[in-house]
Amino acid sequence: MIFFKKKKKIGLAGWWGGRNEGDRYILKILKRSFGRDFDLDVINIPFRGDPSMIGYLNKLDFLIIGGGGLFTINFPEPFDTYDEWGKSLKTPFGFLGVGVQEVNERLSGTFASIIEKSTFFSVRDTGSYEISKKYSDKADKIFDLTFLSPRKITTSGNDRTMGVNLRVWNFDDRRTYDNSAWCHAINGLKQPKIKIPLSFLHGIDDRKAMEGIASGYSRTFSMGLYKKIGLMLGMRLHSLVFAVQNNIPPIGISYTPKIQRFFDDMNLQEFCLGINDHDKLSSLVERVNNDKKRIGPVLDGYNDHAHRAVARYIDNVVETIKNL
């Protein structure tokens, strides 16, 4: 008689419901990485930390949270109230390739508790690591999870055409982002442009943010759009990540720290613009176009290092969960 060992059931919790192409691809990678060895349940963040949800989580053998941005100025539900329900959670959990923007004083104790209770806690950039390691030596630095399986396509070598991604970011009085000024600066560039939207959620639809740009566009996302470009200007992190994975030089607009951190980790800090630096765009585009021979090897090295690091870490996570 042959006995089959029952697979452990693990939950994959993340930003899966936001119609964001970066998050969608992260989930695809997680399913591919863990689906062979485990049964998977997909869980959308945010979710409530009420007794019924905790009861559901306690039926899992393990809970993976991430990747992607998670700990921003305000933690998403239910991690903002972890101190209230954390002791009721019996299932072991770990954080995989997340971003930590900042930890305000009100949530510092909560954040410390979360890391200490985690089986593992890995972040996607050095800035997130520098914050996290102040709270626990469990913190590990890896890279964005999409580097496990880069979205490589065959580019056409059209160096003159620039891909553009803007996002809605002017819905808060505290934010100084001027969408119209960026559209004006982009329209002033002589080279051809293609709009590349990554997020389609109502209220923060990238297509809305790029209405003021006079260029070709797509109503949907496709990696095929990257075949047509030789330079990428982006706000959304994964618009830039997908360019880097195809050795396309990036220019970032740092609307949150994660964008600047991405460029810092590549040692390409000079190619990331501040949120109000639209007046510097034209000169920076010219600089990138003149510096592509230097940038190419930098991107190659980063891609290789990131892929190896994420692959090694996920292999270790699989073995860790198996052995619990």
Can you describe what each PLM-predicted range is?
Residues 1-324:
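Active-site anion-handling motifs in enzyme catalytic cores
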